[in-house]
Amino acid sequence: MKSAGEPQGADPRDERKGEAMGPKAGREEPAGMPAAHPGEKTDYDTLCRQAEELLKQEPWYVSALSNLSALIYAALPDLNWAGFYLLRDGRLTVGPFQGKPACIHIPVGRGVCGTAIGRDETLNVPDVHAFPGHIACDSASASEIVLPVHADGRAAAVLDIDSPRPNRFSAEEEAGLKRLVRVMEAGLRFPPAGGE
């Protein structure tokens, strides 16, 4: 019940001393992981060390990708989705992620994710609405970066990160994410091609 001096319709939980409201606001961060704040630079040295530790604890791809998507989502500011699509039966299938429910299947060669895995290259898209054939799983997404993840010399998955902010991913951030993917590739245990 609201007190007489409190404006009607206001939610006292919204008074978070200048904290940004949005998909990440108010959630607790895992132990040892600082919350990401808009405008803050990501410390990729620390992020890579944290990823290495998670992979040492459990390299099996389902558990590892679940924790890695949570790590990335918590560490990078201004995101609305961070997760993985796995190459399965000739198409990408959604894997572990953080954010709103996502498109389940993406054909190779379609959208940012399908194009990235089809070309086996990182795609850093400053304006997803200008990308031919963009697949909009979340209409709030404005920019996106997709990085292939390899296993046994083949592209086995993509790391997909979306932001509601246009031009979110700088060249410096792209380089940091590529370092993080190399850590993943060294520590992940994927099933053999065609296996589960």
Give residue spans per PLM region.
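Regulatory sensory and allosteric helical modules in signal-transduction proteins
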Residues: 79, 87, 91-137
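Short hydrophobic/aromatic beta-strand element in the GNAT-like acyltransferase core
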Residues: 81, 146, 158
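A generic structural motif
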Residues: 165-167
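Well-ordered alpha/beta subsegment
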Residues: 169-176, 190
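Sensory-domain boundary capping and coupling elements
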Residues: 150-163
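A short, aliphatic-rich beta-strand micro-motif
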Residues: 143-150
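Intrinsically disordered, low-complexity terminal regulatory regions
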Residues: 2-96, 100, 179, 183-196
